[in-house]
């Protein structure tokens, strides 16, 4: 049974030194439950880049996939914005 609602995230590539793998930083704004102040929360995930089209600084869209390796559970969908 295929799951249709896969998670999609948009982030910035911070590393492309591994072969067919990129590290994407996801930045989100979350509100503190008590102080009601917005905080910037970031996390880094490894994503599979089969054709090695993305470079450091690019804005990319990634999608959740089956585990590819110990750390990779995301795959590159498209490069939204190239670094100039």
Swiss-Prot record:
Top-level taxon of origin: Bacteria
Gene Ontology annotations of biological process type: translation
Pfam families cross-referenced by the UniProt entry: Ribosomal_S17
Alphabetized SUPFAM superfamilies for the sequence: Nucleic acid-binding proteins
PROSITE patterns reported for this sequence: RIBOSOMAL_S17
GO molecular function: rRNA binding; structural constituent of ribosome
GO CC aspect terms: cytosolic small ribosomal subunit
Keyword rRNA-binding: yes
Keywords assigned by UniProt, alphabetized: Ribonucleoprotein, Ribosomal protein, RNA-binding, rRNA-binding
Entry function: One of the primary rRNA binding proteins, it binds specifically to the 5'-end of 16S ribosomal RNA.
PANTHER family for this protein: 40S RIBOSOMAL PROTEIN S11 FAMILY MEMBER, SMALL RIBOSOMAL SUBUNIT PROTEIN US17M
Family: Belongs to the universal ribosomal protein uS17 family.
Assembly information from the UniProt record: Part of the 30S ribosomal subunit.
Name listed for the protein in its UniProt record: Small ribosomal subunit protein uS17
Native organism: Borreliella burgdorferi (strain ATCC 35210 / DSM 4680 / CIP 102532 / B31)
């Amino acid at each position: 049974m295929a799951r249709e609602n896969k998670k999609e995230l948009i982030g910035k590539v911070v590393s492309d030194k591994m072969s067919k793998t990129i590290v994407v930083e996801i930045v989100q704004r979350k509100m503190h439950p008590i102080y009601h102040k917005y905080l910037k929360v970031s996390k880094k995930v490894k994503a599979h880049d089969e054709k090695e089209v993305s470079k450091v600084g690019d804005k990319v869209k990634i999608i959740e996939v089956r585990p590819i390796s110990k750390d990779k559970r995301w795959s590159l969908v498209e490069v939204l914005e190239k670094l100039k």
